[in-house]
Amino acid sequence: MKFSIAAIALAAVAVASPVEMEPRTNPSTCNINGNNNGKVVCCNSLIPILGQILCNIAVLGSTCNAGQTVRCCETDANGGLINISLLNCVG
C-alpha cells in the first residue's frame, strides 16, 4: 500500500509540467497610473529643502543609502544627481 501511494505521488510530480511564467519587470521601474513607466529614485530626506531636490535615479539592482527615501517619479531621465521633475514623484 505504501509503495503504491509513493509511486502515484512520484508519478504525479513527474507528470506536472512547468507553467510559463510572466516575465519579471525591470526593478528600476515603478508603477504610476497603472503603467510601469516610472523611475525609482533615492532622495536625501535628512537635508530639509535641498535634499528633496537632490534625487538620484537608482541604478539597476542597487539600493538607496541609509537616510534616503525612495520615490517613484515620472521622468525620462536616465540618471544624474538632480531630478528636475520632482513634482511628478510619488513618495
From Swiss-Prot:
The keyword Transmembrane helix does not apply. Keywords: Cell wall, Cytoplasmic vesicle, Disulfide bond, Glycoprotein, Secreted, Signal, Vacuole. Induction: Under normal conditions on SDAY medium (Sabouraud dextrose agar plus 1% yeast extract), hyd1E is transcriptionally active during the first 4 or 5 days. Hyd1A is the most active at transcription level under normal culture conditions, followed by hyd1B, hyd1E, hyd2A and hyd2C in order. Disruption phenotype: Does not affect radial growth and multiple stress responses. Glycans are attached at N83. Its main location: secreted. It is found in: Secreted; Secreted, Cell wall; Vacuole; Cytoplasmic vesicle. Disulfide bonds join C30-C72, C42-C64, C43-C55, C73-C89. Residues 1-16 form the signal peptide. It comes from the Eukaryota. Belongs to the fungal hydrophobin family. Aerial growth, conidiation, and dispersal of filamentous fungi in the environment rely upon a capability of their secreting small amphipathic proteins called hydrophobins (HPBs) with low sequence identity. Class I can self-assemble into an outermost layer of rodlet bundles on aerial cell surfaces, conferring cellular hydrophobicity that supports fungal growth, development and dispersal; whereas Class II form highly ordered films at water-air interfaces through intermolecular interactions but contribute nothing to the rodlet structure. This is Class I hydrophobin E. It comes from Beauveria bassiana (strain ARSEF 2860). The gene is hyd1E.
